[in-house]
């Protein structure tokens, strides 16, 4: 089994890259977020998960820049009915932190991706709700002030993931704001 690969990106496609490691080109499937960080000629180190697809008689490599994203994939594929491709679609839409929040808050809308029905979304939430605490996500900086601001923006009709991203960006830039100021800045930004 391959733990990680370090090499130069030879080609970037819609859902994978070809990673040149010592003149051997590996096809590595990536989430859209990880894929956007790769450019031809760039040097990258990817954590790797290997999946042997017996139906198609192929072995596929899935790459991750962060350990958290890799752990999310491993949890998602343990849910009955979630394939590696489906898990990567979810991780293309949500960061590990957003996935964590969506499962804890039972946010079915945030988990909605193409090809994922309501039954499977419910199964993901049900099966992973108790397991998300095992995710080693740096969630410490997202404290109660942010949760209050997030709740306020959601109640005003904004989408959870967009509100979360906006609040996180505001807190990263200005960490000592109170809830009222975070909401005010978020409303100007969204």
UniProtKB/Swiss-Prot annotation:
UniProt region (Domain II), positions on chain: 66-143
One family name in Pfam for this protein: RuvA_C
Subcellular location(s) per record: Cytoplasm
Transmembrane segment boundaries: none
Entry annotated with the keyword Cytoplasm: yes
GO CC entries: cytoplasm; Holliday junction helicase complex; Holliday junction resolvase complex
Keywords: Cytoplasm, DNA damage, DNA recombination, DNA repair, DNA-binding
Role, per record: The RuvA-RuvB-RuvC complex processes Holliday junction (HJ) DNA during genetic recombination and DNA repair, while the RuvA-RuvB complex plays an important role in the rescue of blocked DNA replication forks via replication fork reversal (RFR). RuvA specifically binds to HJ cruciform DNA, conferring on it an open structure. The RuvB hexamer acts as an ATP-dependent pump, pulling dsDNA into and through the RuvAB complex. HJ branch migration allows RuvC to scan DNA until it finds its consensus sequence, where it cleaves and resolves the cruciform DNA.
UniProt cross-references to HAMAP family, sorted A to Z: DNA_HJ_migration_RuvA (MF_00031)
Domain notes for this protein: Has three domains with a flexible linker between the domains II and III and assumes an 'L' shape. Domain III is highly mobile and contacts RuvB.
Name of the featured protein: Holliday junction branch migration complex subunit RuvA
Species whose genome carries this gene: Wolbachia pipientis subsp. Culex pipiens (strain wPip)
């Amino acid at each position: 089994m391959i733990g990680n690969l370090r090499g130069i990106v030879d080609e970037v496609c819609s859902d994978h890259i070809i990673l040149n490691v010592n003149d051997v080109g590996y096809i590595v499937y990536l989430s859209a977020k990880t894929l956007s960080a790769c450019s031809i000629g760039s040097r990258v180190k990817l954590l790797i998960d290997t999946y042997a697809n017996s139906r198609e008689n192929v072995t596929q490599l899935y790459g991750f820049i962060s350990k958290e994203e890799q752990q999310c994939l491993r949890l998602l594929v343990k849910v009955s009915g979630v394939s590696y491709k489906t898990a990567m679609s979810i991780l293309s839409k949500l960061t590990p932190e957003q996935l964590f929040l969506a499962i804890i808050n039972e946010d079915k809308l945030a988990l909605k991706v193409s090809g994922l029905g309501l039954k499977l979304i419910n199964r993901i939430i049900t099966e992973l709700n108790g397991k998300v605490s095992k995710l080693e996500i740096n969630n410490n900086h997202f404290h109660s002030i942010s949760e209050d601001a997030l709740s306020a923006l959601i109640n005003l009709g904004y989408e959870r993931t967009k509100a979360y991203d906006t609040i996180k960006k505001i807190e990263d830039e200005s960490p000592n704001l109170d809830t009222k100021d975070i909401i005010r800045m978020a409303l100007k930004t969204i």
